[in-house]
Amino acid sequence: MDPGNYRPVSILNILSKVLERTVHTQLVGYLEKKDIIFDYQSGFRSGFSTDTCLINLSDHVRSEISKGNFVGMVMIDLRKAFDTVDFNILLSKLKTMGVGNTDWFRSYLTGRRQCVSVGGTESNFLDIECGVPQGSILGPILFLCYINDMSASLNCRLSLYADDSTLIASGRDIQTLSTFLSGELESCSKWLVDNKLSLHVDKCESIVFATKRKMKVCENFQVTCFGTLVRRVSSVKYLGVMLDENLSGESHVSAIIKKVSSRLSFLYRNSRLLDFQSKRTLCSALVQPFFDNSCSSWYSGVNTNLKNRLDVLQRKMVRYVLNMDFCSHVDSSHFRKLGWLKIEDRVRYFKLVHAFKIYKGLAPQYVCEFFTRSSSVHSYNTRGSQTDYFISRDDTRASYMINSFTYTAKLEWNRLPSDLKKISNLHKFKAITRAYLFESY
C-alpha cells in the first residue's frame, strides 16, 4: 500500500456545495459564452465526452494516414496534476480570462486544512498549500482554467481530457517526425515547470500510426525529452480504449474478450443464486459496457473475424440470462425478449445518436466541422425529399477513412427514415431509434 498511490479527497459540507454550484454555473456560462476554454479540451464540459474525444483523435489519425503520412503520438503523464495547482498562478490566469472578483476564489482556495484518518486514528492537521479541492464542484473547472493555455506553448496538435494529454503530429519523414515531437515534448515540459506541474517522463508513452506496409520504415521512430527516451509501444490505452499502430482494433477487442469472459465466468458460477431480472441487470451493468465503450470510434475498423468473436460473447451472455444450454441457438427473438440490441445495431444506435447531436448543433465543434448539411450547400431539393442529409467530402472516401466515424455515421444518418430525422427532442429520438432498429428482429 504505497501512500503515493492515494489522493486526498476533501470532505465538504452541503451548504458549501450549494454555493459552489451557483458559482460553477456562472463561471462555466462565462467561459463558454466568451469561448475561452481550449477547443480540444473534452473533460468536464457539457456535450463533450470520452466518445467525442476518441472520435476526433481516431478520425484525425485515419485522415492523415489516408494522405500518406505517418502519425506520431505521445501520451503525457502528469504527477498529481490536480494536487499541485499553484494558487497564485491560477488566480492570475482567472484574472487574465476576465473573471472578476478573484478575491472570492482566493478565499475559496486558501485556508484549508487536512488530515489523514486510518483505522480511526487521525494524523496532525496540515495546511493545504496547493491543489484544487478534490471532491468539490469547482475543482474540475478550475483545473481546466489552469491548463487552458498549454496549447500556446506547442506547435503540434494537443488533445486533452482533463489532465489526460496527448501530443499528435504527422509527416512523411519518420526521422523528422521523431525530432519534431521530441522538441514539442520538451516545450510541453518547460510549460509544465513554469506552471509548477511535473511531467512523469518514465510513464509517458509514444506510438506511431501507419499502414501495415509502412510500419517497417517506423523502426527508427523514437521520442526523447532532454535526453530521456520515451517508451515506445505498439498499442496504447487512451480513455479506456486500446489504440494499436494501424487502428485495427485488435488490441482493444482482445482486451474486451478477456474482461467479458472473466465477468461471465464469475456470473455463471453464481447463476443459481440469481433470478432472471437480477441476471439481466448484472449483465447490463457489468458486461455490456465493455462492448459499448466508445464503440463509435473503433468498431468499424475491426475485421469480420473479430466482430464474430464479439458476437459469440454477446450470445453467450444471452444464454446465461435466459438459462439456455451452451449449444442452443440464439436468434433475434431472444434479443427482443431481453430488450438488447445486437452489437452491430448497438454501434449503429450510438452513431445515430452522435449524428443527431451533430445535426442539431449539440456536439463539439471539432466533430461538427467534418459534417456538412445539404441545406447549407443546396437551395433546392436534390433527392426528391425535404429531409436534410449529410454530404461526404472527397477525402472520406479514401481507404482508411471508409472505417472512420465521419464516413460511417454519415451513411447511417442518410439511410434513416425522414420522419426520424425530423424529431427535435434527443430523448424521443433515442427511444424511437431503438424501436426502429428492433423492427428487423
Regions flagged by a language model, labelled:
Residues 228-297:
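Basic, alpha-helical interaction scaffolds
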Residues 365-408:
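Amphipathic alpha-helical
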Residues 1-133, 169:
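Conserved pre-catalytic core of RNA-dependent polymerases
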Residues 7, 23, 77, 94, ...:
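Short, conserved catalytic/metal-binding micro-motifs enriched in Asp/Glu and His
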Residues 10-17, 42-51, 63-67, 79-83, ...:
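Conserved, non-catalytic sequence blocks in retroelement Pol enzymes and Pol-derived host proteins
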Residues 7, 41-45, 71-81, 131-139, ...:
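Catalytic palm active-site di-aspartate
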Residues 62-70, 189-207, 214, 306-376:
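Short, charged alpha-helical motifs in flexible N/C-terminal segments and linkers
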Residues 121, 183, 198-234:
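Short, conserved micro-motifs composed of acidic
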